Amino acid sequence: MPNIKSQIKRVKTNEKSRQRNKAVKSALRTYVRNFRRAAEAGDVEAATKAARVANRQLDKAASKGVIHKNQAANRKSAISKKLNSLAA
């Protein structure tokens, strides 16, 4: 446990950030999973809606610094690729 006042606060804020980031990442996995399920079922309309939600959440997470912007871009690209192959 740190002795310096600023470091004590840092430990608290880091823990808050960790919990928040963990929740956001968990939600991201859920949104992507929902898209994959819709895509595997062959439901183009549901997959399109799920892809829109997943892409929006990925962008939000990247802008907040939870995930790197390139990781968000790669995931969005994979979602788009799968959606396009489904529609074709």
UniProtKB/Swiss-Prot annotation:
Keywords: Ribonucleoprotein, Ribosomal protein, RNA-binding, rRNA-binding. It comes from the Bacteria. Gene3D superfamilies: Ribosomal protein S20. Residues 1-25, 68-88 are annotated as: Disordered. One of its GO terms (molecular function) is small ribosomal subunit rRNA binding. GO terms for biological process: translation. One of its GO terms (cellular component) is small ribosomal subunit. Binds directly to 16S ribosomal RNA. Belongs to the bacterial ribosomal protein bS20 family. This is Small ribosomal subunit protein bS20. It comes from Cutibacterium acnes (strain DSM 16379 / KPA171202).
